[in-house]
């Protein structure tokens, strides 16, 4: 399975690791299918680290899962924050996943086994480059100009056009 995030600065195609993180992918795909992420801003953007989105409030404090509550982490020794373009759930401690997620700008091994890796960017690294270049508020790391997820396309075949 794969999805394409259509953003204000371009598209990002993400392969999902449904076999290793079934609950996380079920949640993410259901939120995508219900247009939950449409209009969400990238509210946190730290050059060299990651960009975060998935909060419909746009504050970094909102968002929920399809079950209406936080859900457990799904860690795998095979899924690491080892390269640019890793997609993980954002959380505020163990087993507190909701709707927010982030995409890494590089290798981040200190995040392994703390944040559920559930996908990787397979196309659109140039869009990730554009996100990383955005000027941000130096205290909050929020982009000075909002960039949104416009909508999301779900692909059954991650290699389909």
Curated annotation (Swiss-Prot):
Q: What is this protein called?
A: Peptidyl-prolyl cis-trans isomerase-like 3
Q: Which GO terms describe its biological process?
A: protein folding
Q: Name one Pfam family in it.
A: Pro_isomerase
Listed Gene3D superfamilies: Cyclophilin-like
User: Which family, according to UniProt?
Assistant: Belongs to the cyclophilin-type PPIase family. PPIL3 subfamily.
Functionally, this protein is described as follows: PPIases accelerate the folding of proteins. It catalyzes the cis-trans isomerization of proline imidic peptide bonds in oligopeptides.
Keywords associated with the record: Isomerase, Rotamase
Source species: Gallus gallus
Q: Which reaction does it catalyse?
A: [protein]-peptidylproline (omega=180) = [protein]-peptidylproline (omega=0)
Query: By which gene is this protein encoded?
Result: PPIL3
